[in-house]
């Protein structure tokens, strides 16, 4: 699987970079997690800082166009992203009970 970055847009207000990328693959469309790991390796980031939003493969093609958000830190990703998107990308969600317990200690 080969990842090519098509465009990068810096979003300093949300501490992230929006990336459009293209993947050339031999078999079926790769999973979201394998794409996330490959993209993170390509840009030298931790996989918890990368949130893949969209993967689009045209029928019969061996190319996938995708959209991802790369955050400065995993905490920034947890603060900004919606819970369902964090679950799709297997990024651990901090619960409110843990937060209140940590603040009380």
Swiss-Prot record:
Gene3D superfamilies reported in the protein's UniProt record: 3.30.70.330
Gene name per UniProt: rps24e
GO biological process: translation
Pfam families registered for this protein in UniProt: Ribosomal_S24e (PF01282)
GO cellular component terms, A-Z: ribonucleoprotein complex; ribosome
Similarity-based family: Belongs to the eukaryotic ribosomal protein eS24 family.
Name used for this protein in its record: Small ribosomal subunit protein eS24
GO molecular function, one term: structural constituent of ribosome
Entry keywords, A to Z: Ribonucleoprotein, Ribosomal protein
Domain of life: Archaea
Family annotation (HAMAP family): Ribosomal_eS24
Alphabetical list of InterPro entries matching this protein: Nucleotide-bd_a/b_plait_sf, Ribosomal_eS24, Ribosomal_eS24_CS, Ribosomal_uL23/eL15/eS24_sf
